[in-house]
A protein has these predicted regions:
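Glycine-rich beta-strand-centered segment in the early N-terminal region that forms part
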Residues: 21-38, 49-90
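Short N-terminal binding/cap micro-motifs at the start of the first secondary-structure element
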Residues: 10-15, 41-42, 75
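Short beta-strand or tight-loop elements
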Residues: 13-18, 63
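Cytochrome P450 core scaffold surrounding the K-helix E-X-X-R motif
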Residues: 42-48
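A structural motif shared across PLP-dependent enzymes of the aminotransferase-like
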Residues: 87-100
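Glycine/small-residue-rich loop that forms an oxyanion/phosphate-binding "nest" at active or ligand-binding sites
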Residues: 84, 102-103
Length: 103
């Protein structure tokens, strides 16, 4: 899948749109097919001034989309649900695994 990542802090040019492994929903997660993202102030601040915690850090805090898989412990969501979600990173990708409680 494709995702927006960065390896060093800096201007918008440090962002790259690259292939990364598909995420997998853990037991408490939902896997979302991302259809819309937001660009938050934190995205801008982090990209400009914070080195990523590991290479190819997927940016983004918030997105909307459709649930395509649910973890074994998830009862509050089902495949096909349209959701919005907020978490600490990873929303600027084609798919995003996020705790169900954050949707």
């Amino acid at each position: 899948m494709k995702a927006a990542v960065y390896d060093v802090e800096g201007a918008p040019g440090v962002l790259q749109y690259v292939d990364v492994p598909d995420p997998v929903a853990g037991p408490d997660d939902v896997l979302i097919s991302v259809e819309a993202i937001s660009i938050e102030g934190g995205d801008l601040i982090n990209r400009r001034s914070t080195p990523p915690p590991f290479p190819s850090w997927i940016v983004g805090y918030a997105a909307a989309g459709t649930v395509v898989a649910v973890g074994s412990k998830v009862c509050s969501r089902k495949v096909g649900d349209r959701v919005t979600a907020f978490s600490m990173q990873g929303s600027h990708a084609e798919r995003w695994a996020v705790p169900a409680e954050r949707t």
